[in-house]
C-alpha cells in the first residue's frame, strides 16, 4: 500500500477527482456506480466506483500543494493518469460571483511545492483536453463558467488579510497586479498539481 493514501494496486481508477476536504468524498462518490470506500488515512480519504463503465476514484488531499502533490504522486504509482482538482476558490476578477464555476487554464506559481519539480520559468498550465471537457460540462449543466488563470498561494490568511502582514505592501501590490492581468480567482493547489502532473506525464 502507498505510504500516505494507504491504497494498493488495483484499488483506484485511471481518472481521479481531487477535493481538498475528506468530508466531500462521500458526496462525490455517491455519483459513482457501486462506490466503495478504499482507504482513509490522515487527510486522504479514497472511494472508487465506476462511471459509464469506467473505473474512477475520488481522493481528498487536504489543503495546499504539499499534501496534494503527495496524493498525485502515490495515485500515479497505482496507475492513475488523469486528475481533476475540485474545490473552493476566492474570486479576484470582479465578474466572478459567488456560486460561479472557474475552470483554470493555468496558475500563477505563488507557492513553493512546484519549485521541487520545475524551475520558476516553467509555466503551470492545465491540460488542454481536460480543461475543454470541464468547461463544456460546466456550461452544459447551466453554471456561469469562467476560464482563465488563477493565483495559487501557500498562505490562506496571509492572502485574505494582507494588511495584517509585515509584508503587506508587497502582497497588496501583487494583488493589484493579478486584478489588472485578469486573473480569475485565488486558491492553493492548482500550480503544484499542474506542474507535478507534467513532471509525471499525467493530465490535470
Enumerate the predicted regions with their spans.
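Glycine-rich beta-alpha junction loops
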Residues: 22, 90, 151-157, 192, ...
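Short secondary-structure transition/capping segments
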Residues: 95-98, 158-160, 198-199
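Metabolite-binding pocket within alpha/beta catalytic cores that recognizes anionic/polar moieties
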Residues: 1-133
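Active-site rim beta-loop-alpha module in soluble metabolic enzymes
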Residues: 125-182
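Generic secondary-structure signature for well-ordered alpha-helical cores
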Residues: 30-37, 106, 135-144, 155, ...
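A C-terminal functional module that forms or caps the active site or interfaces directly
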Residues: 174-204
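Expand to "…catalyze enediolate/carbanion chemistry for C-C bond making/breaking, isomerization
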Residues: 77, 167, 199
Amino acid at each position: 500500500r502507498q505510504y500516505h493514501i494507504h491504497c494498493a494496486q488495483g484499488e483506484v481508477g485511471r481518472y481521479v477527482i481531487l477535493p481538498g476536504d475528506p468530508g466531500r468524498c462521500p458526496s462525490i462518490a455517491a455519483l459513482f456506480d457501486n462506490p466503495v470506500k478504499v482507504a482513509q488515512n490522515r487527510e486522504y480519504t479514497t472511494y472508487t466506483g465506476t462511471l459509464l463503465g469506467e473505473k474512477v476514484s475520488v481522493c481528498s488531499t487536504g489543503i495546499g500543494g504539499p499534501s496534494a502533490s503527495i496524493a498525485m504522486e502515490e495515485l500515479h504509482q497505482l496507475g492513475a493518469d488523469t486528475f481533476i482538482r475540485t474545490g473552493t476558490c476566492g474570486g479576484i476578477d470582479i465578474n466572478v460571483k459567488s456560486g460561479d464555476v472557474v475552470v483554470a487554464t493555468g496558475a500563477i506559481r505563488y507557492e513553493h511545492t512546484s519549485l521541487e519539480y520545475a524551475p520558476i520559468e516553467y509555466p503551470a498550465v492545465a491540460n488542454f483536453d481536460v480543461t475543454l471537457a470541464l468547461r463544456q460540462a460546466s456550461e452544459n449543466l447551466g453554471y456561469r463558467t469562467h476560464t482563465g488563470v488563477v493565483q495559487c498561494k501557500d498562505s490562506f490568511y496571509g492572502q485574505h488579510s494582507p494588511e495584517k502582514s509585515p509584508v503587506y505592501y508587497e502582497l497588496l501590490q501583487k494583488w493589484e497586479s493579478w486584478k489588472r492581468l485578469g486573473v480569475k480567482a485565488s486558491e492553493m493547489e492548482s500550480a503544484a498539481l499542474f506542474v507535478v502532473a507534467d513532471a509525471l506525464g499525467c493530465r490535470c
